Amino acid sequence: MAGLSLEFTVNTWNLRSLSQVPCPLRHGFRFPRRLTRRRTILMCSDSSSQSWNVPVLSSYEVGERLKLARGGQQFLAMYSSVVDGITTDPAAMVLPLDDHMVHRGHGVFDTALIINGYLYELDQHLDRILRSASMAKIPLPFDRETIKRILIQTVSVSGCRDGSLRYWLSAGPGDFLLSPSQCLKPTLYAIVIKTNFAINPIGVKVVTSSIPIKPPEFATVKSVNYLPNVLSQMEAEAKGAYAGIWVCKDGFIAEGPNMNVAFVVNGGKELVMPRFDNVLSGCTAKRTLTLAEQLVSKGILKTVKVMDVTVEDGKKADEMMLIGSGIPIRPVIQWDEEFIGEGKEGPIAKALLDLLLEDMRSGPPSVRVLVPY
């Protein structure tokens, strides 16, 4: 390049004489198998004679720096099929950079709450990640029961009784190309995070998201490609709102960035939720629909429906709520510039939240898996 001269010197050690030997610039660097501690200096000179001093670290030094960087994190245990084991050292909770989930987004994930020593809706979330993996054409590294056993054991090793279990299925490490054909094998990762499951029943404001919604083929897969979701959330926060609401091209309400939505209409007697055809099928949302039948039995609600909901109808609803495993139900009192109902938290959202919390604490074995600590 005209006007720019490069002078790279990498000081390595000769194994016999321990004298420094210059290594010319190539496409990569070849290091001796045994090295003493050293500092590599990469000199890049141009008209301004700039230089940088970048240390080359031993594996021990890398580990020590990672421990400092991870200080205070509540990461209690991680499983990686790459090493086929569980670690409780946060500094060791790393992924290969050549994993296609990292550099190509070819991976899917899911989560399950840990509540009082039980995994809530583990089977439902596990079924969903397996569907997502199939749609993303990611082969399974293990069968379903083995994956479930690994997830439960990871929580058991962590000792966490209240927190979150997150897990991923990836095309796996192999190279930095687009196709996964050279990936060694698909991978499973899982991590246990200690969190405070705080319930906030205070109503929030939402806004209509201007970020393009994912097409159904991708919206129905819980993949790691969350850039639209992140941008939607950032847009909402910049407008002083809790979340953004996506609307499909036909004008029907879709979902939030990581939650479903529901409405109470017809004088507070009907619970309606947008169809799941073009959005991610929410496990907590589906469980809420099941629990809502108890309100029908008590005469509090007349019907529970899954149907198309227009923005106009949604904004005219008596109540609106967001539903997701981390919330789990949050009332919405304002959408854009319009108040929902009376502009305050409604009774149905509270009743559904109470039912869901009771289900999390003492629900049937179909939704609660005991962790053997």
Swiss-Prot record:
GO molecular-function term, one example from the UniProt record: 4-amino-4-deoxychorismate lyase activity
Assigned EC number: 2.6.1.21, 4.1.3.38
Tree of life domain: Eukaryota
List of residues binding pyridoxal 5'-phosphate: 128, 255
Mechanisms controlling activity: Inhibited by hydroxylamine or amino-oxyacetic acid.
Positions of transmembrane segments: none
Catalytic machinery residues: 222
Pfam families (alphabetical): Aminotran_4 (PF01063)
Cell location: Plastid, Chloroplast
PTM sites of type N6-(pyridoxal phosphate)lysine: 222
Pathway membership: Cofactor biosynthesis; tetrahydrofolate biosynthesis; 4-aminobenzoate from chorismate: step 2/2
Reported cofactor(s): pyridoxal 5'-phosphate
PANTHER family xrefs: AMINO-ACID AMINOTRANSFERASE, D-AMINO-ACID TRANSAMINASE, CHLOROPLASTIC
Quaternary state and interactors: Homodimer.
The protein's name in its UniProt record: D-amino-acid transaminase, chloroplastic
Organism: Arabidopsis thaliana (Mouse-ear cress)
Phylogenetic classification of the source organism: Eukaryota, Viridiplantae, Streptophyta, Embryophyta, Tracheophyta
